[in-house]
């Protein structure tokens, strides 16, 4: 039985997004592209090629293993690895920073030559392979201090430090030692941290001059300081210098007087501080790189691997003799030393007349079989007459138009050289990813069209796709977006997003090319409306409506008459305006409603009131319905809440308008608030809504329910039935009867006394 390996799947949200995209593309039995069919066929082939297991439970085990492969494993929330390129989401809001990187320490007289140097004039002597030895690694702390200058004084603006490893080594040629720094990242200082109040213009900004000091201190390593960089202290120096510090407190320093003076790459003399107040120069230089970079470039360069000892660099001391090879000649001859050519070694003549200079006469010389220049690229000649004619008249061929309609050069027609790979062109470098992975979040995609649709979720950047078959596939150029509205946070304003069900299949190729008809067809009438937060609205001044110009009777060949009085109208006179009488229309609607026998009187009453209000407004579009609906509620609020049946009919009307997507939800909420206020006013006035019950009468007995075992006389309770009363109620009734009898006796006595 073979072991089933688990494959890392996509995250939950992105997996659902891909599933929804494929589902919308298949609506109406329409596939989005041929790439989707190829992916399905590949999955089918992989499923059929899976070996079957033996045993009775083989089918169940196969299903379980398939489910394990399909299930995506959880991605760790805290991880040091980042799949995508470290781009800043808030690119526009970040400021530039000063980046200072300590590169190496080398001797001031040490020359630098690359490996593989050969002597001129075809001597054939190659350089010896580099054998780095005596590598010493020392733990140290690198401290950076930035000073600003004002009134001739130095002001400390920024101090930072980090631990690092100093690797001291020398090559086999016996050159001076060299130092490399490991496990140390460049210092990145935002420009706002080194702002200074300038003297000339009284502006708080960057100063005209900055000086940088780099100090290397001991980090508890017993090997400090490096013996190769600092010569040992003699007894005479120790005797005459009483203030000499212990060796573990010695500090290596390098100072840059002004970072604006020279280029970015700076070589500064290394000094050693053996005393508390003075230092002395050494024969070594510290190379530093100082430049202004954006945060994107800073993070991109930080991802580079730590610099190690490169075997391609050979440093040869001109004072030391050149080491010999095994067969005797010199190991390297770089056109002499200090520009002076060394004499050629004497060559012994062989019996056959050939010279032995390290190469055989039968072997071809280097570069003899290679062309001296690149081959001429011939232009392909097109012999298609139809295509030549289309190019001459400026007409687009059918194949190109179909390709552009399906996605053009960025569609699914171009087979990538590498399976689902793509290259991103960034300002500092290039990044190559597989499986159409997103550059920012690292999400993988099935095809290129899905990747282009996915990048619409990152509006902070613009992505320009280009297909280069000679370069090896797809190339994407990434730039910060030029839309200032999205940078300033315009998209953070609260807006209504109303989305409905899709009405047609999703053509992903057209969508990524800019055709948003599939999205706009789903948007509701309230989409894009700004939501005014409570308390932030600015009261608007009432607008003055301009006075309408009076309409005059035009001058025509035929006379015009008044529609009511039939009087002839003279040209130039004001046109008479008669009020519109809609009473006949209301009467007609009222008669038509009375003809319906399946409507209750309450329904007819509400419909007549609604028609009488809405027909007088002469609404020509559904856009004006919400405002007149609110006006109807405000005017008829007391009438609507006076009866329960009117409220029920009003609810039916609201449900109908909501189902037709004519009435927005905010209008319904406002209308409900108006009706609630009307009900509150009605209760304050002491009115009762008709149709509501008067309320259950308060019972005199507080304990009206008894168990059978708690009744003192069950037989009497069965005989009396509903007229049976408990003991407390019987006592109360007897007391009430006695009080009534006493009142009757008192009234009778008063009547007798009066008579």
Swiss-Prot record:
Pfam families linked to this entry: VEFS-Box (PF09733)
Gene Ontology cellular-component terms listed: nucleus
Region of interest (Disordered), residue spans: 26-79, 333-377, 392-420
Keyword Signal: no
Compositionally biased spans, kind Low complexity: 30-42
Record's keyword annotation contains Membrane: no
Keywords, comma-separated and alphabetical: Chromatin regulator, Metal-binding, Nucleus, Repressor, Transcription, Transcription regulation, Zinc, Zinc-finger
A Gene Ontology BP annotation from the UniProt entry: chromatin organization
Composition bias type Polar residues, residue spans: 43-57, 349-359
Cited CDD domains: VEFS-box_ctSUZ12-like (cd21552)
Feature: compositional bias, Basic and acidic residues: 411-420
Top-rank taxon: Eukaryota
UniProt cross-references to InterPro entries, sorted A to Z: Polycomb_protein_VEFS-Box
Main localisation: nucleus
Residues in C2H2-type zinc fingers: 436-458
Region of interest (Polycomb protein VEFS-Box), ranges: 580-645
GO MF: zinc ion binding
Physiological role: Component of the of the Polycomb Repressive Complex 2 (PRC2), a histone H3 lysine methyltransferase responsible for generating mono-, di-, and tri-methylation on Lys27 (H3K27me1, H3K27me2 and H3K27me3). The tri-methylated form is known to be critical in gene repression, and its proper placement is essential in defining repression patterns during development. SUZ12 is not a catalytic subunit but is required for the complex regulation of histone H3 lysine methylation by EZH2.
Assembly mode: Component of the polycomb repressive complex 2 (PRC2) that consists of four core subunits icluding EZH2, EED, SUZ12, and RBBP4, among which EZH2 is the catalytic subunit and which minimally requires EED and SUZ12 for catalysis.
Entry's family note: Belongs to the VEFS (VRN2-EMF2-FIS2-SU(Z)12) family.
This protein's name: Polycomb protein SUZ12
Protein source organism: Chaetomium thermophilum (strain DSM 1495 / CBS 144.50 / IMI 039719) (Thermochaetoides thermophila)
Organismal lineage: Eukaryota, Fungi, Dikarya, Ascomycota, Pezizomycotina
